[in-house]
Amino acid sequence: MNKSYKWVVKAGSSLVSGNQDGVNIDFISQLASQIDFLRKNNQEVIVISSGAVAKGMNDLGIKKRPDQLAILQACAAVGQRGISEIYQNTFEKLGYTTGQVLISHDDIANRTRYLNAKNAIEALLDLGVIPIVNENDCVATEEISFGAVSYTHLTLPTKA
């Protein structure tokens, strides 16, 4: 792999969630190992991750997915911190720093905010940081009920 590519890896809730403290640590470790290989071969990698609501439910002892939006948002707020910490701890063992990027639908709909998010991701990559992108479920409304949205278009070239 001589030519540099930008890889976008989507880690959905069913992969990220697990029995070990609400997170599938084995999956995240394997993912980190594969990303380490790519990075050592001059490849850029962005991780789009889900799992904050499931992690928060685990941390709060909630067994059944709540119907109330505010409770789902609270679970996301609690879980996102833990998900981010697990990614950082896992990648740190391999010598990498991760950066948490939380995106909402409003960020995508507003051109200025969209470009700011895209530029932040590009800056993280330029600094050698692995961006971990997740939907900001704490402020999400309807979309939290339907699951995570892919933000791969943030990584594509755009016209300013």
Where are these regions (language model features)?
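Short, active-site-adjacent cap segments at secondary-structure transitions
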Residues: 15-17, 52-56, 108-109, 138-140
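Ligand-binding beta-strand-loop-alpha-helix segment within the catalytic cores
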Residues: 65-140
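Short acidic, glycine/serine/threonine-rich loops at helix termini
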Residues: 19-21, 56-61, 111-115, 142-146
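N-terminal glycine-/serine-/threonine-rich phosphate-binding loop
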Residues: 1-46
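Glycine-rich loop at the start of a catalytic domain that most often binds anionic cofactors/ligands
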Residues: 52-69
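Conserved small/polar residues in nucleotide/adenosyl-binding loops
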Residues: 152-160
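Charged helix-capping and loop-helix junction motifs
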Residues: 25-29, 114-118, 146-151
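Short beta-strand segments at enzyme active-site cores
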Residues: 8-10, 44-56, 98-100, 132-134
